[in-house]
Design a protein with these regions (language model features):
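Short glycine/proline-enriched turn or capping motifs at secondary-structure junctions
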Residues: 3, 860-863
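Glycoside hydrolase catalytic-domain context in secreted enzymes
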Residues: 20-836, 845-861, 870
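Flexible, membrane-facing loop/turn or short amphipathic-helix motifs
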Residues: 839-840
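Short, structured beta-strand-loop surface elements
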Residues: 866
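Bacterial Sec-dependent N-terminal signal peptides
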Residues: 1-23
Length: 872
């Protein structure tokens, strides 16, 4: 009888929470994500739990758990997942000093992401691929402490406060009002900002406590405590001898215990491998110990496959299953919050037509406009001519430079795929009358020669370029699945479930690309192919001349062909792939050697030269195989403009031309000689798909520039401390004692502004019984002849703190003023405004004492006004 009673009790308990409709608690959408996660967790075996702890989360079919892909990217729009709206690169968004606009950009990104996720689930029966999930590993809120860092373009600049405000805006836009539209991720935690070439071995062990709390951690804290970010990514490097993904101090003591973070922590991709790999961190003897160390320290999810050894770590007593349960609970709770486990969500009603729609692209255009920084706009040296900008479209204008007609440069890195891109040359074309525009590339960004594509010179089926014929079989058989025409180099891939063309499979397909070329003079052609697939074959007049197989990343020509004058050549590329992801990057062209003297002759009639230079994401970025003068592994070794451009600009100046220099880069470039040779200068960063239109609007006066530098532009590399030194002394505007070329916060306008004397408005008792915050009220007047935006900036200085920052940004506000209009700008003065490092507690806190409130249009001392205050 006792046995029957016990059995009955067990049955009753097991069904106590079973809804009437027969669903198990974790399947009941009316229950909270916490309750559902706890219920599902108790039903999983250890092996099933571990299968959920890697970025390619495994299904548990007996419980209805679908596979899930945690890794997704949205640095400046949905990335790696087909066509989407592309915004300016993150550093360009920071230059807007407009956190409301940035939030709008990422609200758009999360809207498009929800649609893409729904379409992917419907098409794949819930078996989505990488880059189709709802968890986005952005924003990057590392501090851009050194302009040599190639990934600095992914950040929001060198200032902790600006980075915090932009990062909070990104998280709010991605996560939405309910916090679960998509999930954002604050990365890379912590003390991480290059170099790229040693990030798997580097140990940040020379960081002063005040640098940690005043510089490296504030943005992460803001995203956790204010924006309630759902994920945090731990970095590759070591901090104080421990890999960041194995640092209990960072992940448990600070992140969870002090800041109250209750989301999940993911590793950077394959970072756990660095724990046990000889020659890298090698802090653990093997995978098993590395896995246990990472999870014990607080890394819930691994991007990679090392965690597969966790069951053995449990068996050896290196970690408990209870500790693994804590991590798996967080993962399950996040998936329930997103509705990823449910048959439908409210976001499923968003129509597919919103993807890359015109309204979204207009926001991208506005972000590009607001992020353009006017560095210089001076009258001629003799004073006889007015400032060069805005340009007169009736003039004869020569457009020169390696970035003028480069669409890919505009995209930055970690980019999506726009439906169209407007290059800077395209934008200028739209303003200048026919016959008044001269275009010459003139130089490469960094190399002595340049590769010029000739994909458009041939014809096939009566159309220019290359004709493509696709088959949904790997052997070119069966009906034609799709056709297409290409006049630019092929950049085709299936990453993120992006088909080569509509109607073409993602796997097991083939393609034929064909054209016929004929030249008036002898012409050598170079063919390049980077591929991932079964094979790529090049045919000339029906004969196969070269075959590549598997994965090929070599950028050297696969084949050279000398075409005789007047003779037609039938060219064909055949590409085939089986299962798995694939890529086909193909180009046909020739290497160009530049002739500066010939260029000067061709632009002799130009009234003005617009030189579009700088560098590109092909030279700076994440752990890149780049080896050229001034660059190393994605980073830079010299911050000057590359020599080939510097010399050409000097020659154009010597020829007597007035020059507008447009600098495209994700980092600060020293422009000392260029400032002497050029009458006007713009910094446009990597301005996104419509960046060319925004630049042209600015050049011709339809957009009044209002961007501000989120970085310092140094005079030369000699002004920088060692790249490997993470101490802030001498770095950025906050600690720099020398005078830079252009200061943080700098940006000119086509109008002028005047700042009146500010006053402090004290806190008052409100009708609801609460106290208003104390405010600094600053009168600002547009003293010019046209409307424009001004970015009002407040810096705080603690004169009695000789070891702290010289000054540090604590508030800003973008305003629009009509000619003659005055507005009173109110900036909050709260505890955070006066938060300073306290040497006694080792933490940030509002300290008593003397402060200087410095307000004005930039961080330059000569434009700032001051109010002295004393805090009790």
């Amino acid at each position: 009888m006792k046995k029957i009673t016990a059995t009955l009790l067990t049955l009753l308990l097991s069904t106590a929470f079973l809804p009437a409709q027969g669903l198990l608690p974790y399947q009941d959408t009316s229950l909270s994500p916490t309750r559902r996660a706890n219920d599902l967790l108790r039903r999983l075996t250890l092996e099933e739990k571990v299968g959920l702890m890697m970025d390619q989360s495994q299904p548990v079919e007996r419980l209805g758990i679908k596979p899930y892909q945690w890794w997704n990217e949205a640095l400046h729009g949905v990335a790696r997942n087909g066509v989407a709206t592309m915004f300016p690169q993150a550093i360009g968004l920071a230059a807007t000093f407009d956190d409301e606009l940035v939030e709008q950009c990422f609200d758009i990104a999360s809207t498009e992401a929800r649609v893409k996720n729904r379409l992917a689930r419907e098409k794949s029966n819930d078996n989505i691929r990488r880059y189709q999930g709802l968890t986005f590993w952005t924003p990057n809120v590392n501090i851009f402490r050194d302009p040599r860092w190639g990934r600095g373009q992914e950040t929001y600049g060198e200032d902790p406060y600006l980075t915090s405000r932009m990062g909070v805006a990104v998280v709010k836009g991605l996560q939405g009002p309910d916090g679960n539209k998509t999930h954002a991720c604050a990365k890379h935690y912590a003390v991480h900002s290059g170099p790229e070439w040693n990030r798997h071995v580097f140990n940040a062990d020379n960081v002063a406590p005040r640098d940690l709390w005043e510089t490296y951690l504030p943005a992460f804290k803001a995203l956790v405590t204010e924006a309630h970010v759902k994920e945090v990514m731990c970095a590759y490097n070591r901090y104080e001898n421990e890999p960041c993904c194995g640092s209990s101090r960072l992940l448990t003591q600070i992140l969870r215990n002090e800041w109250g973070f209750d989301g999940l922590v993911t590793s950077d991709c394959w970072a756990i491998n660095d724990f046990y790999t000889p020659g890298l961190h090698h802090t653990e003897p093997d995978t098993i110990h590395a896995d246990a160390k990472a999870v014990w320290s607080g890394t819930d999810l691994e991007c990679g496959g090392s965690y597969i050894a966790l069951p053995e770590a449990v068996n050896l007593g290196l970690i408990t299953e209870d500790r693994i349960d804590q991590s798996v609970f967080r993962l399950l709770k996040a998936r329930f919050e997103l509705g990823e486990m449910d048959p439908s969500t409210p976001y499923d009603t968003i129509p597919a037509s919103v993807i890359a729609c015109e309204a979204h692209k207009l926001v991208s255009l506005q972000a590009a406009r607001e992020g353009i920084v006017l560095l210089k706009n001076a009258p001629s040296a003799d004073g006889r001519k007015a400032p060069l900008l805005p340009l007169n479209p009736k003039q004869t204008i020569a457009v020169v430079g390696p970035n003028a007609n480069d669409s890919v440069m505009l995209w930055g890195n970690y980019n999506g795929t726009p439906d169209r891109t407007v290059t800077i040359l395209d934008g200028i074309h739209s303003y200048v009358k026919p016959g008044k525009l001269i275009y010459e590339q003139g130089s490469d960004c960094a190399f002595e020669t340049s590769y010029s594509s000739l994909m458009a010179v041939g014809k096939h089926n009566g159309k220019p370029g290359w004709s493509a014929t696709y088959f949904n079989t790997p052997d070119f058989s069966g009906p034609v699945a799709a056709t297409a025409q290409y006049t630019t180099n092929l950049r085709l891939y299936t990453f993120g479930a992006t088909a080569f063309a509509a109607g073409v499979n993602l796997e097991n397909f083939s393609a034929q690309f064909a054209t016929t070329v004929q030249f008036e003079k002898d012409q050598e052609l170079e063919f390049t192919l980077q591929m991932l697939g079964t094979f790529g074959q090049l045919y000339v007049n029906g004969e196969m001349v070269k075959e590549l197989k598997g994965r090929v990343g070599d950028k050297e020509p696969m084949y050279r062909l000398l075409c005789k004058a007047g003779k037609p050549y039938e060219l064909e590329l055949r590409f085939s792939t089986g299962s798995g992801q694939c890529a086909c990057m193909f180009d046909m062209g020739h290497t160009t050697t530049f002739d500066d003297d010939a260029l000067l002759r061709r632009i002799a009639k130009a009234d003005v030269v617009v030189f579009v230079g700088g560098i590109s994401p092909r030279l700076e970025g994440e752990e890149m195989p780049v080896s050229v003068e001034g660059f190393k592994g994605g980073d830079r070794t010299d911050i000057q403009l590359p020599r080939v451009q510097r010399e050409l600009i000097a020659k154009i100046h010597k020829a007597g031309k007035r020059i507008v220099y447009v600098n495209c880069s994700g980092s600060a470039i020293s422009l000392v000689p260029e400032a002497e040779h050029c009458d006007a200068m713009l910094q446009v960063f990597y301005p996104g798909q419509l960046g060319g239109q925004a630049v042209a609007e600015t050049l011709f006066g339809d957009n009044n520039p209002s961007g501000r530098l989120p970085i310092t532009i140094y005079k030369d590399t000699l002004q920088l401390p060692s790249f490997l030194d993470y101490r802030m002394k001498g770095r950025t505007y906050r600690y720099m004692e020398q005078k830079p070329q252009f200061c943080f916060g700098h940006g000119l306008s086509y109008t002028t502004f005047a700042y009146g004397d500010a006053h402090i408005e004290p806190a008052t008792l409100l009708e609801d019984g609460t106290m208003s915050e104390e405010r600094l009220v600053i009168p600002v007047t547009n003293t010019g002849l046209r409307a424009g935006d001004e970015v009002v900036q407040l810096y705080v200085q603690r004169p009695d703190d000789k070891e702290g920052p010289v000054k540090t940004l604590r508030a800003f506000r973008r305003i629009n003023l009509l000619p003659g209009e005055t507005k009173e700008v109110e900036l909050p003065l709260d505890d955070d405004t006066f938060a300073w490092f306290d040497t006694h507690t080792g933490r940030m806190m509002s300290l008593s004492g003397r402060y200087n409130l410095l307000y004005g249009p930039s961080s330059a001392d000569d434009v700032l006004k001051c109010i002295e205050v004393t805090r009790p």
